Amino acid sequence: MLEMANQLSEDEEYSHALKFYKSILQIEPSNIGVIIDYGVTLQNLGLYHQALTTYDQALQLQPNNTSALINKGSILHTLEKYTDAITYYDMALQIDGDNPVALVYKGLCTAEIGNIQLAIKYFKKALSIDNEFELARVSIDTAKCIMKS
C-alpha cells in the first residue's frame, strides 16, 4: 500500500495518494515516515493548514525530525511567515548543521526579508556541502543578480 501511495505521489496524483496514506495511518498511526509523506501530499494539494497540523503530529512523536521541521518551515515560508519559517530551519540546523536543504530554505527566507548578502552565505554553505544542489546554485545566481541591480 505504501509503494502505491508513493508512486501516486510521484505521479502527482496527490488526491489518490492521500487516500492510501490515510489508510496506512489507520493501521500504523505512529509511522513517522507516512505521517510526513501525508503532510507533503497535503502541502502539494495546497492544504497548508492541514499539512501544518500533520507536521505538528510528526514533531510530537519525534521533536528532532529534520524532515518534519524543514517541511513545516517550507509551509510557513509559502504563507509568507518568513521569521517563523527560519525558526524551524534553525531547529533543523541545530540537529544537522550540514543540511543543505535547510540552509537553502533559510537563505530564501532571509532574502525575502531583505538580507540578500546573508542569504548568499547560506547558499554558498549549502553548495559547499552539496555542489550539485541545483536550488542552491539557482538561488545564489538570482541573489547575485539582485545585488547588482
Language-model segments: residues:
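Helix-start (N-cap) detector for alpha-helical repeat units in TPR-like alpha-solenoids
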Residues: 32-33, 66-67, 100-101, 134-135
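Position-specific recognition of the canonical hydrophobic site in helix A of tetratricopeptide repeat
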Residues: 9, 36, 43, 70, ...
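Terminal, low-structured helical/coil segments at or just beyond the last alpha-helical repeat
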Residues: 4, 120-121, 127-149
